[in-house]
Amino acid sequence: MEAEASGRNRFLFISNGHGEDAIAAAVAARLPDTVAVEAYPMIGSGNAYAGVCPIVGPRATLASEGWRNVKGSLRRDIATGGLATVPPALRFLRKVNGKYDRVVVVGDMVGVLACYFSGHRGLTYLDVYKTGAARLYSGPERWAIKQACKTVFCRADNLARTLEHIGVDARSAGNVMMDAIPYGDYDARTRRSRALAVTLLPGSRALTSESFALQVDALRSLPAEMRPDVFLAVAGSVSVDELARKTGLKRTPMLSVEPSDLGELSDGDLTIHMARGGAMGNLLATSDLVLSQAGTATVQALGLGKPAITFVNPRDRRSRFTDEQMLFGEARTVVTADAPAIGAALRKLLSDDEERRRLGNIGRQRIGGPGAMHAIIDALMG
């Protein structure tokens, strides 16, 4: 095998989404130098791997960007040529079968199934999709996992138990999302001037600018004396110019030398401090709550004890949204997709310190803490 001939262990990370890329990159970055790592982001640019490891495999884009929380996303992907992305992915995976000492799948069953159908076995699977609060693994999912995977890391004990019962080495060692919160070179605290702060997490996909505009309208509805400091985590695939255009805000020049600083958006009344998504942890550390339409980032914010306000878009796939809410509970406040409703939820939380603390504690308890990263690295290097 090529991996054996090189004298150096070769690992391939396969991920299928922005949040999944970030988690996989965080794991890869913690591996020792004795491991040569490559990454195959199945969807999107894979920007999260920049500076961590080389990217391999065909690039693919989908209308949904892999986001299955929106109704009809699969139909739209198929209608816009999404099926055409499957053959190149399977060809690549067949071509590299046997060339890596370890293949690590991060995400949902898409990566596992792609590997199964291309002949890969003995996978390490980091399931960051299923929460254990609603649906467990289906019969076909359990069968595919047993065939293709050697070790599975689950987010919940009940998920791991369902796999253990069929002979799979399944573990629940903590929430790897909490180990993978990104921190960068950005001093959010020195930008604070008000009593409270809010971080905006509008997401990383097609609806980002639309979501951001609603969040900004809600902030504008607040009385001046209640306005918090506002921070925005900008995912790598998001256009700041589009965010500015959608909201009527103007981008100010970047004044600091911090690599993660993206300047400000302002209209003279409302100012939003922007940082790269790679510094999201910095923003959350100094914030009291979040307005979030994101996936992975919402989980991470709740796990840090930051209550979230999320609005339901008419296009959201309600089954997935409901499954998530069973896990998040009261820690995530859900409102309709209009600025007055979002603004009312904001006013309530900004004016009630005790309620924020209560919801923050619920989030920490529901999401669970870090710890999975150490177990994952041990398993990969064992």
Whereabouts are the PLM-identified features?
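Nucleotide-activated sugar donor-binding and catalytic core shared by glycosyltransferases
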Residues: M1-G382
